[in-house]
Amino acid sequence: MKTDYLKFVKWSNEDDLYIGYCPDLFIGGACHGRDERKVYAELCRLVANDLQRRKREKQPLPRREAIVAMHLAV
């Protein structure tokens, strides 16, 4: 099974922060911060750690099912 899960960072006006998401592994936001690049780097670290833990504990990897749709204003 492939381990390239969808990861993205989104600005939250409500929180006034960037929030990092990986919907197939974590419910809701996994990390947050004011610097978009740092949030993405932290998200990648969290995903890698979670996948290593699952492998070490012989847990099955979740299916990659996340789909992101964007509404584009014209």
Provide a role label for each language-model segment:
Residues 27-32:
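Short, well-ordered beta-strand elements within core beta-sheets of diverse protein domains
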Residues 1-8, 34-37, 41-74:
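Short, charged, surface-exposed hinge/linker loops at domain edges
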Residues 10-26:
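Short aromatic-glycine-(Arg/Gly/Cys) micro-motifs in beta-strand/loop hairpins
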